[in-house]
Amino acid sequence: MIKLIPEEALRIYRKVQSANFEVYFVGGCVRNMLLKKPVKDWDMTTNATPDALLKIFPKAFYDNKFGTVGVPVDKKIIEITTFRTEKGYSDKRRPDSVEWGKTIEEDLARRDFTINSIALKLDAKRSTLDAILIDPYQGQDDIKNKIIKAVGNPKARFKEDALRLLRAIRIATEFSFTIEEKTWKEILADASLINEVSGERIRIELLRILASEFAYEGVLLLKESNLLNYIVPELIEGIGISQKRPGRHHVDDVFTHNVLSLKFCPSTDPVIKFAALLHDVGKPKVMSKDEEGLVIFYNHEIAGANIARKICDRLKFSGKERDKIVNLIRWHMFTVDEKLSDAGIRRFIRRIGVENVKDMMDLRIGDRLGGGTQTAESWRLKLFKKRIENQLKPAPFSINDLAIDGNDIIKELKIKPGPKIGDILQKLFLEVDEDLSKNNKEYLLKRLQELSK
């Protein structure tokens, strides 16, 4: 296993070890090495106190009460945490008090799942033969059997940090593992504890689920665990809401369609996949029936965009991520019409934003396949995408793309800066948008004289 550890992490490890302290690689890095998966963070644990670690690493920093020291290495941070025991979790997130532990076994006892409670100790000779795994909870067996199991008492672990409820789902999703029966039953019983967790922490775990190859299965697991009822209850409202209409491809209820749209959305961006999952979230709110008694969802895209905005704010998405999700949902019902003019194509691009075109097409593919259509793209959609590509090359999508600007107007018409300049530019832009050949300086300067009369 030592061959899998990068040299910079080994240097840090050896420095602590050479100062006569115990030190171990621990947690996700050991788990992923055993799984032969990429390792992101090379976390360590030691019996050295934070003060002792700061003496070993003068450039390290320590600004928390949980014993974690950050050591900067090649633009990365390697975290080293002192052995600790924890008492009381009144906020279901952080321990009320922390005491330094004496042994690695004490430290491993406070961790969440058995597969994360394995420590790796290296001998001073850097020999792979003498690398020792400390595994008091048989985490290696659970890795082999693909099982997620809480360390010790599941109820105690989840009450210590309620995010572990969601983390169990996330790890099971990422590695396609099964959650052990006692652990699963406790998740079902304690699902409401997730309300104690901040939206930001929930969002991080949720996006990791959506980024997984098994995102579809992960969302279904969230539903089965009751966690989805508290994380995104708006999705649950779609259960049992029929969409069947004569001549329409929808055969599933709204919830199932949303989840299938996520499954078939070709984007690998978890933010776009979240938009696919939420794209019809407005349907339950606007559902009604027409004069024939058939179900309709008039303006569901508008209602859905408003609901998605609230969800994103609750989960502390960045403004940029939220606006993208809302935009995609608001306009996902765009019509693919082969008779649409080039100017109409350009208006569509401006409406959704050039940066959102590919994401909108991915959402449409997910929507189609998630609704039971057998082909990802109709001939109309393929033609529409081709026409969009053609218009993205030469088209002026804003006033700034015109062949003249405000300075040209001031110079040509000999007027002072003011609102009139913006009005003139807008008129010129609308004219050019209908006929791109007019976007040349000679023509536009001539039109200036006509517009100023």
Question: How would you label these PLM feature ranges?
Answer:
Residues M1-K453:
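Catalytic cores of the polymerase beta-like nucleotidyltransferase superfamily
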